[in-house]
Amino acid sequence: MAYTLDDFDYDLPHELIAQTPIKQRDTSRLLVLDHQANTLEDKHFYDILDELHAGDAVVMNNSRVMPARLYGIKPETGGHVEVLLLHNVEGDVWETLMKPAKRLRVGTTVTFGDGQLTATVTEEREDGIRLIEFHYDGIFMEILEQLGETPLPPYIKEKLDDPDRYQTVYAKENGSAAAPTAGLHWTQELLDQVAAKGVKLVYITLHVGLGTFRPVEEANIEDHKMHSEFYRLDEAAAATLNEVRANGGRIIATGTTSIRTLETIGTKFKGEIKPDSGWTDIFIKPGYQWQVVNAFITNFHLPKSTLVMLVAAFTGRDQILNAYHHAIEEKYRFFSFGDAMFIK
């Protein structure tokens, strides 16, 4: 069946968009959707323990959000410049989104902080994208931690008191422009309890790009072009997942980024799980044939977003929109700092 963009729309009261993280990560609410039984249960995230069984694997994305927003000036004019780091091309060359782009030509220099970091535009691309090369003394990531800000999603209007609350407790690999937010609910203590139950904890890496916030503009969703994101699944992770599968356990993904990684690999290797890394622009939507993931944890996503379509590919459109309407009635909190779903 052909879907249009409006098929994935729903009305969300503005006050249900969570502006701040909940005090204790795992006390957020959890809406459990049993896809086969077509049932909904209202729980809390710490109840996820009851949903996981010995022999299952929980997959998490260990990408870390970088303080990817920098504010600088052009020394020759004093003009202000905003830079958003998208990804590291090679060495000190980065693909960035710069404002005001039309004034930033090849050869333009920008200075950050009190001059401990400078950058030169090396290539102009469309949509405000620029390649820039950084110049500095010392360690780039340490300088970035000092000078950069963590970019929050556009619908979050409040400043974050503690930047660590926009990182998962297992964030390790620098590279994301946005957090893999389903993972924000996990605490180290809860993960320890999960492991003690005989569930395997598996880490993959997918660096979340800003395209994750890019709205779908095509009425026919088939025409939408997905952004690309870098992913990696190492040999140890692949071996664990294959062992779990062989023994009849479930592969449970934490978040859409883990899903995209696992399904990219499953699609590429015709259902098999192999170590792999590369760039993925997989668009999972209704009609998609699932290869790897048996169940997953995810937050509540924006109306008309590719992430709602991804979830609908697992549940069917009507079932997920019905669950969202239930969540709205029950005043669940939505989006990045909001509550979670467990879909099985």
UniProtKB/Swiss-Prot annotation:
Compartment annotation: Cytoplasm
GO molecular function terms attached to this record: S-adenosylmethionine:tRNA ribosyltransferase-isomerase activity
Pfam families in UniProt: Queuosine_synth
Presence of the UniProt keyword Cytoplasm in the record: yes
Keyword field contains Cytoplasm: yes
Pathway involvement of the protein, from the record: tRNA modification; tRNA-queuosine biosynthesis
Record field: catalytic activity: 7-aminomethyl-7-carbaguanosine(34) in tRNA + S-adenosyl-L-methionine = epoxyqueuosine(34) in tRNA + adenine + L-methionine + 2 H(+)
An example Gene Ontology CC term for this record: cytoplasm
Top EC class of this enzyme: transferase
EC number(s) on file: 2.4.99.17
Keywords tagged on the record: Cytoplasm, Queuosine biosynthesis, S-adenosyl-L-methionine, Transferase
UniProt cross-references to InterPro entries, sorted A to Z: QueA, QueA_dom1, QueA_dom2, QueA_sf
Family: Belongs to the QueA family.
PANTHER family: S-ADENOSYLMETHIONINE:TRNA RIBOSYLTRANSFERASE-ISOMERASE
Function of the molecule: Transfers and isomerizes the ribose moiety from AdoMet to the 7-aminomethyl group of 7-deazaguanine (preQ1-tRNA) to give epoxyqueuosine (oQ-tRNA).
Quaternary structure note: Monomer.
Protein known as: S-adenosylmethionine:tRNA ribosyltransferase-isomerase
Organism: Levilactobacillus brevis (strain ATCC 367 / BCRC 12310 / CIP 105137 / JCM 1170 / LMG 11437 / NCIMB 947 / NCTC 947) (Lactobacillus brevis)
